[in-house]
From Swiss-Prot:
Record key words, sorted: Disulfide bond, Secreted, Signal
Position of the signal peptide: 1-26
Record-linked InterPro entries: Bifun_inhib/LTP/seed_sf, Bifunc_inhib/LTP/seed_store
Protein name (Swiss-Prot/TrEMBL): Protein LIM2
Subcellular location: Secreted
Originating organism: Lilium longiflorum
Family: Belongs to the A9/FIL1 family.
Origin superkingdom: Eukaryota
Main location group: secreted
Gene: LIM2
GO cellular component terms, A-Z: extracellular region
Pfam families per the UniProt record, alphabetical: Tryp_alpha_amyl
Disulfide bonds: 29-66, 39-55, 56-81, 68-88
């Protein structure tokens, strides 16, 4: 379970760093992605609770394009690190 917490934390940090590294995006995108850190406890495997209102508010504040671009960056990480693609369906 500790490794899953570490993975979830790492993913959230990557989200933040990916948003911060995009100079073409406004600081609003970076700040909004950073606010998603409040969703950290909800994204851990085994969590059956509902996300906090703070998490939901942060998610509502993120621009759709900003969120999609950040997710695309994260999904490309295995390739950039010479790792096999992640297949969540299997």
């Amino acid at each position: 379970m500790a490794s899953m917490k570490s993975l979830a934390t790492a993913i959230l940090v990557v989200l933040l760093l990916a948003a911060l590294s995009r100079e073409g995006r406004s600081q609003n995108c970076s700040a909004a992605i950073g606010e998603l850190m409040t969703c950290g406890p909800y994204v851990l495997p085994g969590n059956n609770g509902a996300p906090s209102e703070q998490c939901c508010s942060a998610l509502r504040a993120v621009n759709h394009g900003c969120l999609c671009e950040t997710i695309n960056i994260i999904s490309s990480l295995p390739d950039h690190c010479s790792l096999p693609a992640v297949n969540c369906a299997s």
